[in-house]
A protein has these predicted regions:
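Feature recognizes metal-dependent phosphohydrolase scaffolds
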Residues: 1-173
């Protein structure tokens, strides 16, 4: 594998060109009106889930245990599952974007958004790990394995789906 811009004496340091690129990307991300409008729309219309016309909509999954029951996910020392997990996650996401969130909470919320992207019990990811790096640099397909959470095994099981719907206050048919 060839990494021509990595300095062996200081591998975490970026080259001047990389620094410039990161500065431009950071500026674009922080000042993008379009991104801000998209985030505002998401936060205004449900954030982590939405219920409309007796349908529950969400991005990826509801973390489940092996037996199909709702999985407890610990956030800052407290356990949440199902609807409570989605509500707490949405609240934390909003804390990251609210101007009046205290600094310590805001920093946690920003870190939590990163976790939502690739975390094991994240309702937006729900896999045991992310193997993007492995897929790019390791030829062995065994290194590419991402085990999906139990929701993906049960998402066609009417009994389990009805239990999830019930936990959100939505009646299955």
């Amino acid at each position: 594998t060839f990494f021509p811009t990595i300095n062996k004496e200081n591998p975490y340091a970026l080259s001047e060109e990389e620094e410039l690129l990161m500065d431009k990307l950071t500026h674009s991300f922080k000042t993008s009106d379009k991104l801000r409008r998209h985030i505002d729309c998401l936060l205004a219309h449900g954030c982590m889930y939405s219920i409309a016309n007796s349908n529950r909509m969400f991005h990826a999954s509801v973390p489940l245990n092996k037996d199909g029951s709702l999985k407890d996910v610990t956030i800052r020392g407290k356990k949440y599952k199902g609807l409570e997990l989605m509500k707490k996650t949405g609240y934390i996401v909003r804390e990251a974007f609210n101007n009046d969130t205290p600094k310590e909470q805001k920093l946690f919320a920003i870190d939590y958004i990163w976790y939502l992207w690739c975390g094991k019990d994240s309702p937006l990811f729900d896999k045991n790990r992310m193997t993007t790096f492995e897929r790019y640099f390791i030829a062995d397909p065994a290194a590419h394995t991402e085990v999906k959470g139990y929701y993906y095994q049960y998402n066609n099981d009417e009994k389990i789906i009805d239990m999830i719907l019930d936990s959100f206050g939505v009646q299955g048919e």
